[in-house]
Amino acid sequence: HNAMPSPILKELAQVITNAGNDDEVKVIVLKSGGDRTFCAGASFKELIAIDNLEAGDLFFSGFANVINAMRTCGKIIIGRVQGKAVGGGVGLASATDYCLATKYAAIKLSEISIGIGPFVIEPAVSKKIGVTAFSQMTIDAENFYSAEYAKEKGLYANVFETIEELDQAVNELANKLASYNPEALSELKNVLWQNTENWDTLLKERAKISGKLVLSSFTKEKLASYK
């Protein structure tokens, strides 16, 4: 279900940073494989294996680093969300600059239900959909919210019936952006992410909170029941 293990998170952060520094790259499209799930968030297998604070901190820093790479990258990032997004997947969608989805792209913030919380992704999600929607979804942790809800709250700019229509819209937008003045787009990116300069520190602090909670006996028992 497109869960995100640490090596993939590390690679993703690096690829985004490199693309941001590459003059040949005009626009970035963030997408995932398959047609069922966009991103299921943290890898349960890895969460279960975390047995010390350092490992927990390191794991959750993976998502922090990707969000910070997206935020500081000088290129506009289009999100292509073809299926469900859970936890960290919602965080990645929120960190794009313009996100398009299919009607199957429901979202869920399930972290509280397994004993942790969406702390690393909160700044990105709250910035995109507002604190009210974020807190509602976080507290109502076991329910999916529809793609229409996500559009209503501003996560998705548009929702399509099929993946084919989604891809057509993504390609059209990417081509359009590629024809615009790259300097203007770079300035736009700066403006869109103004006042997030403290996120380098903030998201690392949030990763520490999640890293600590994943070691709690409550969370350990909860995760063990999913084995």
What are the residue ranges of the model-derived segments?
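Crotonase-fold acyl-CoA enzyme core
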Residues: 69-180
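Acidic-histidine catalytic/liganding microenvironments
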Residues: 22, 50, 73-74
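Terminal peptide-recognition signature
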Residues: 11-12, 30, 43, 76, ...
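C-terminal alpha-helix plus adjacent terminal tail
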Residues: 22, 35, 141-149, 163-227
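Glycine- (often His-adjacent) and acidic-residue-rich active-site loop
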Residues: 32-66, 85
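Conserved CoA-thioester-binding segment of acyl-CoA-metabolizing enzymes
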Residues: 1-31, 68
